[in-house]
């Protein structure tokens, strides 16, 4: 790894050593969310992300539905809003990454098991009732930064059943989107190294678009509407 990459890794490790005890103490009193957001925000900055927020993020019981370009989307969004992430179940077993995801309150789902779609939606519904926003990447994978892939509708059922707001979120790296994108089939470790070695800061705009009433739309309508709104914000429609 380059000197830049080593410096970033050491800085993130030191930051974790500082934040983790503070998070643990706050958890004893039912808190800790601030430290998760603070850590992710610092990680985003260390990785060269310069974040601009457009629109007003909703708070409380809500589902953010976002396009997914890179693993950098997670510190970008998680460092901006106090939200938990819906993640594929495999991540729970990824040593350090899985451990950090659990600390952050991620909800793990098995998306490949269509037979368990009802169970997964129920788990997300229960998490929404806890009052902290959830982030869903309905493409169920990363895009190429040029176009949106179709949104999977199954987990939108949770928003309908919980009767919560669904807010489309467009993550936009501008002309750098294709460069930042996680290529299909690329290994996670290789993508981490690539981003750690990347020299120049990159501007990312988080567009928090007009919220939708999840109680009045079914899962397919929510998937179609959020896809259309995000496509429009990114200039892809």
Residue ranges and their predicted role:
Residues 36-89, 100-101, 144:
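Conserved H-X4-D acyltransferase segment
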Residues 127-156:
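Catalytic-site beta-strand/loop segments enriched in glycine and acidic/polar residues
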Residues 1-52, 99-104:
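A transmembrane-helix-recognition feature enriched in membrane-embedded lipid enzymes
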Residues 74-123, 128:
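Membrane-embedded segments
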Residues 96-98, 145-221:
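A cross-family acyltransferase "interaction/gating" segment
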Residues 108-110, 209-215, 229-231:
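Polar-ligand-bearing catalytic/cofactor-coordination segments
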Residues 61-63, 106, 131-137:
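Residue-level preference for the first positions of well-ordered beta-strands
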């Amino acid at each position: 790894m380059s000197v830049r990459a080593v410096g970033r890794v050491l800085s993130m490790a030191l930051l974790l050593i500082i934040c983790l005890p503070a998070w643990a103490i706050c958890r004893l009193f039912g808190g800790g969310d601030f430290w998760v957001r603070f850590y992710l925000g610092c990680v985003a900055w260390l990785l060269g992300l310069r974040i601009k927020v457009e629109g007003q993020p909703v708070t409380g019981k809500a589902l953010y539905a976002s396009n997914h370009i890179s693993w950098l989307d997670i510190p970008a969004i998680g460092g901006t809003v106090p939200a938990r992430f819906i993640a594929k179940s495999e991540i729970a077993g990824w040593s350090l990454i899985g451990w950090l995801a659990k600390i952050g309150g991620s909800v793990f789902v098995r998306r490949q098991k269509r037979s368990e779609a009802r169970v997964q939606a129920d788990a997300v519904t229960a998490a929404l009732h806890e009052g902290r926003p959830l982030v869903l990447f309905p493409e169920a994978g990363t895009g190429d930064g040029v176009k949106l892939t179709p949104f999977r509708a199954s987990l939108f059922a949770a928003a309908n059943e919980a009767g919560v707001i669904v807010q489309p979120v467009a993550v936009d790296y501008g002309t750098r989107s294709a460069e930042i994108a996680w290529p299909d089939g690329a290994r996670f470790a290789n993508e981490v190294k690539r981003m750690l070695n990347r020299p120049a800061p990159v501007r990312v705009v988080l567009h928090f678009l007009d919220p939708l009433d999840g109680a009045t739309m079914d899962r397919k309508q929510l998937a179609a509407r959020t896809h259309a709104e995000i496509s429009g914000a990114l200039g892809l429609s």
